Amino acid sequence: MKRNDTHEPTIERVIELSGIETIHPGGMAMTRRAGEVAALAPGMRLLDVSSGRGTQAIYYARQFGVEVSGVDISEEMVRTASRSAARAGLADRVRFRQGDSQRIPFSSGTFDVVVNECAVGIPENSQAVLDEMLRVVRPGGVVVMHESTWRGSLSPAEKDELADRYGTTPLESAEWIEMLGRAGARDIRAEADPWSRPEMFWKVRVDRDVRRPGAVLTPVEKARTALRIARRYGLAGIRKAFENERAFYRAVLDGKLGYSLYWARRPAA
């Protein structure tokens, strides 16, 4: 969905510049729950859309015994994920390829389950992402997504500003459900609790537990990231990054921004 660059570097951009591995709110507990609602079982074929460094894809293969394909727009991420799968001894069951989530490079009906973890709202055309997810899942198969969700009462201007600061586009739960329906999904379900609790937004590190806002990066990581921001955006970029962080945490703590899990089926042929 279209955003402007008024608030660069966004939250998403700062995490990218930090070079650390982060995952979605709720951490691996959310990934485990996604596997549960999809009823994953050994031998099933799963597509992880916007697979990043491959952490979740490897988890699905290990935890549920499924065959996993991952697709990501970044060739660097694809290389990193492929190396991680090889180190995990799963190169024969977890494979990655470069591709756009708005034009997924697989044939229709290829997968039993298609998941997208916190990356539907990043591309400009989120509807195209959902359309493609429904296209490549088999008839009767399951699609799973989890995404940031507006909560409470916000004006359109507030939503636009927060989305620009965040670097992704949250929607109201009813809007995500409507978009899944337009893509052809049926039997749509949503789960907001416990995923919308503020503490879930700090659980984005795979290497350690984060218990409070502002502690996602360590002091050393913050200093290193600030230097990278300054090189690209100047001192104004550092000020903007702190401003965005404060606005983001305030929205979470005030209950304006939440997180939800959605799952649905493609109708059987």
Question: What residues fall within each predicted segment?
Answer:
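Short alpha-helix
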Residues: 169-184
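Conserved alpha-helix/loop element of class I SAM-dependent methyltransferases that forms part
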Residues: 24-42
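A short SAM/SAH-binding and catalytic strip from SAM-dependent methyltransferases
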Residues: 113-125
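A short acidic, Gly/Pro-enriched loop at the edge of an enzyme's catalytic core
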Residues: 102-113
